[in-house]
């Protein structure tokens, strides 16, 4: 302040005021300074409050202010005197010298310093209070935390003590228990764990079955959505593809009975073919809504179409009906197990035939027998699909009883024919002399077919809608080939072509072909041939179809044995047997026999045209080898009167073999007897015949009998020993015979020969041979039980005779299977070598 220049002071804004203002301001400043000087010292103010804490900084400021006050008091003494004496001197410009300015600023700085010190003291006081409050809060927090930790430690210590006490008490109690009580507790614990495991396994099985059922249902729904759903009386979305549209159109026309391409009597066969499955699905959908009763659903089905067809077609229709029924009726005790509903539907068909077939002379099914037999079949199938039969058995029994009563008084209209639905083709069908010959198939082992002879065949057989719709070869009745060959009709291919067939099919002397001049029993040729003099009388009127309707294929075989007829190969041992020279060719699944002159012996040209051979023969016949069986009789045969000495002077060693042609519906089995120049040639014929028979003949199913109410002597109720002797004495025993002939046992489809190759056929035959062996062993096990149950009754001989018949039948079938298997294996080995 002392260094300020006079020039700067004179030009300062503070000194540009009007005259008189400076004096007034100075008076005010003096008044303020007097007031300030009258205040107590800063140290007194700072220490007056007991809560004030004066920092060292504040003490230094106080000392500075105090020193300035002392200096001010010394300097202001002359000024005060000057002010008192010269009250108007403030208006005089000369009095405003540098000293006055310096005093003014010193006073002003002192006042500001005092104000700043006071503010700083207040701030320090507030800060101190806040710090003290925070300190007190921290102390309280630390105390609370310490108390909480102490309480937690106390609780932990208490729990540890309590646990120790409980454990000690438990140990004390356990020590006081006896060994027997401990064993009892262990046993109960183990039993409880076992029950829990069993319950867990049961739940897992149920869950798995539920998931599978849901998956099957979802797959069905997805498939139905893709193909489109059509219901009677309501509009549905059009199928996506032209094939779907065509299938929908045909299904609607079949339901309405106006489909013109086939007779209405062939609708069931048409729907049941594999290639028409898409049409079948839409046909079943058009039957909706399906009743919640299986018998009523079946009744609705058979009133829509003429339900006389092949077993295979019926089986497929019933299967699709079962699938659709379980889908639309999911709340029944059958759930999603359509395969069980399929069994029930087939049982209902069999029951209907049993109750209402006038030609059935067997005892009728009772309600109990029908129920027990159907439940037996359901039980076998339910074990494969996780169906709890025990849980639903009461309801199923009641349901089957209702079905029995319904069919007892309301037969299924299987033979119903609506004259209003006939079409142009019906008139020709009414005069047709054919009986359709097709292969049968059923999952309930109701496999069947209708066989017929030459007289009951027609070339139209192979131009039907069903056969023409399939590109595969169909089964041909044994003597249909003869009729076609005689009337110059083309012979269809009977087998599936394989690469080896192209090489060996006409290779003479192999498993594929044998063509040679041999001898044949003249009686066999006369009974088998279809010569020119009788050819015009081969067509007869059609045999009525009243012999059983759809269940004609359930009728029993009339032969005494399944594989052997009344005729035996005695010609080889009969010196009076007349042998004639014939040319025999075995090729492409058929056997051709020609009698012509001049006779030729030994191997022939297997490539020679058959028409030329036929023209050169006065007697001939052709037969398919389906189900046939060739047998080498013996290596050395007793020589007859026509023997010739050999060059060595010994008797010729001729070969002899037979060929059995199975029986058809109206024809007995045929036994053909042949004689060759040597055993090796006979062996080649036997191998070739059995090779083609094995390729053409489907493998029998694994189950041979349908649901039957007959008692043959080994039913479970008899073997259980629960029946008293009196009941066994009065029990009616039926004579055991195969329910179905061997041709009725096959599960192959109509085009099966197109689907099974040699390698697969060998594997299937091997599996079936093993099954037959197990079946024979199982049948042997019941013999001791039968003896113990029947030996004291008058039915003993009859029961054991039934057992023996079935045993012989199984052994014959086993022998036949082994022959077919060996023939295929031999052909396979010959190709490899």
Swiss-Prot record:
Topological category with respect to the lipid bilayer: Peripheral membrane protein
Q: Which domain of life is it from?
A: Eukaryota
UniProt region (Disordered), positions on chain: 1-51, 152-194, 215-246, 420-483
Q: Which GO terms describe its molecular function?
A: guanyl-nucleotide exchange factor activity
Q: Tell me which Pfam families the record gives.
A: PH_GEF_YEL1 (PF23633), Sec7 (PF01369)
Q: Which keywords annotate this record? A: Cell membrane, Cytoplasm, Guanine-nucleotide releasing factor, Membrane
What this protein is called in its record is Guanine-nucleotide exchange factor YEL1
Q: Which organism is it from?
A: Zygosaccharomyces rouxii (strain ATCC 2623 / CBS 732 / NBRC 1130 / NCYC 568 / NRRL Y-229)
Q: Which gene encodes it?
A: YEL1
